[in-house]
Swiss-Prot record:
Pfam families: EFG_C, GTP_EFTU, GTP_EFTU_D2, LepA_C. SUPFAM superfamilies: EF-G C-terminal domain-like (SSF54980), P-loop containing nucleoside triphosphate hydrolases (SSF52540). This is Elongation factor 4. NCBIfam families: lepA (TIGR01393), small_GTP (TIGR00231). Residues 11-193 form the tr-type G domain. One of its GO terms (biological process) is positive regulation of translation. It is found in: Cell membrane. It comes from the Bacteria. It is a peripheral membrane protein. GO terms for molecular function: GTP binding; GTPase activity; ribosome binding; translation elongation factor activity. Disulfide bonds: none annotated. Belongs to the TRAFAC class translation factor GTPase superfamily. Classic translation factor GTPase family. LepA subfamily. GTP binds at residues 23-28, 140-143.
Amino acid sequence: MNIEQLKERQKRIRNFSIIAHIDHGKSTLADRILEFTGTIDKRIMKEQILDSMDLERERGITIKLNAVEINYKSKDGKNYIMHLIDTPGHVDFSYEVSRSLAACEGAILIIDAAQGIQAQTLANVYLAVDNNLTLIPVLNKVDLPSADVPKVKEEIKETLGLDPEQALIASGKTGLGVIDILEQIVTRISPPQGDIQKPLQALIFDSYFDSYKGVVPSIRIVNGTVKKGDQIRFMASNSVYEVVEVGVYNPKQIVKDFLAPGDVGYLTAAIKSINHVRVGDTITSQTNQALLPLPGYKQMNSVVFCGLYPVETNKYDILKEALEKLKLNDSSLIFEPESSNALGLGFRTGFLGLLHMEIIQERISREFGVEVIATAPSVIYHVYSIKGEKLLVDNPSKLPSTQMIDRIEEPFIKATIMCPEIYIGKVMELSQNKRGALQNIEYIDSQRVMINYLLPFSEIIYSYFDKLKSLTKGYASFDYEIDKYRVSKLQKMDILLNGEIVDALSLIVHHDFAYERGKAICETLKEFIPKQMFEIPIQAALGKKIIARQTIKAMRKDVTAKLYGGDVTRKKKLLEKQKKGKKKMKTLGKVQLPQKAFLAILATK
């Protein structure tokens, strides 16, 4: 192809992503688009075709983003090349959404015609607006008996500020509206900007490890071209490689001769080092280098931390390798080695949220065969010492002694909760119990409200979302953004078994909630720790002060059973001997903490 032909081809490229609240039918609609355009043969079609992980299909959610090239002949008679970049809908994976949007010019915003606008819909709209994307609203699931199109169109106008007349109606189940969506993509989303004659600039928006091809980055070409044999340089890591292969996803890999501006695909270059490929980095040509990297997506910081330890201690190295490989296409995952007296060697690991933490643990177990124990999740605290120093603490065991601390600040979040009006009282009660401060209540319509709360992040990382769902019978939706740090009355609480501190059970608690939290943990441990030959005290302590205690009674052996008749002093002598033996056992005895006790404690909050 000559330059003019390539420029003409570029005018017929459309890059778009599909964004939606979790469970609004995004993956199903993507399936219908792929089926209608003939991208996927009906014989090999399976539900959620772009959700390549088994875990995604089982849970019915999208975790990783996926890109696929679609060829579509429009009503104007021209053939268009479309790149659909599928995105997750859960709040924890908004970084995946931001990566997708950095590679697009437009987005299809899917809204469930029965449920209406949800909290995450709102968050995704703001992300799209920040990226200057053209938004095409689509009302999905209009075939449901409970669908209320006029009401949802009114919500689009009032809550999102978009023109409701431009909203399309569709059904991912029946395929209704797919042609309208494709035609709107052609007419409303602009072709990609980019100059074929400028030095190569390609944005890495994802990557994964292939045991034969090495590290494979997914890229969006902004300027220039790339083909087999080119010398390329990764601008952040400054590493140079020779391109072995370029191609696109369909959704399996299809090798191409070259990739030009607007193309979304992949390249391989026998990259063996995981650290050389960073998501958000720019690839340029080694011989004709771009001066500046592309303004990439924003780097997301981990906000929830926990210790991950292998159940079988000899699998430490496999766990390390698993985390390194998962980090490759999940740039927000961070980890560093740590050790615990109770659990041995493991890693302090950072995540974007609780679902993210759960998914990573499950992937380690499924893909690498390593069962892990996770300690209680915590957030990053700002600790100011009496000398004026500021410490960042994500692990309770790193907290200095109380005498050395001037004040502790914890992160707060701005929470947006949408729910039916009848559940306002329950939502407010739950949020107040989690130390929340009400900011605003706004009626979306006569039945639904939007409630804004300021909440400590440490309070929602346990079971806030689960409780919210059960209190509102599943009707509430929840989204949050990190706000600033605020001073709180926080203290470190230690759990002692037989007088010894168990470091893996230490946690940072609010002073007002310390007693009930300590009492709950002691009761849980009493239930799950098996009896020993000696008595085991379980204590919760704030500094030197014990605030809660439970005792596991000793197993009793009847040492007087062999006596018959005779002197009572003989009986007393044997009981005294047993008492001394138990006292000695107690000083020497170690209490083993079973894994199920750890898991039960995580569920107590």
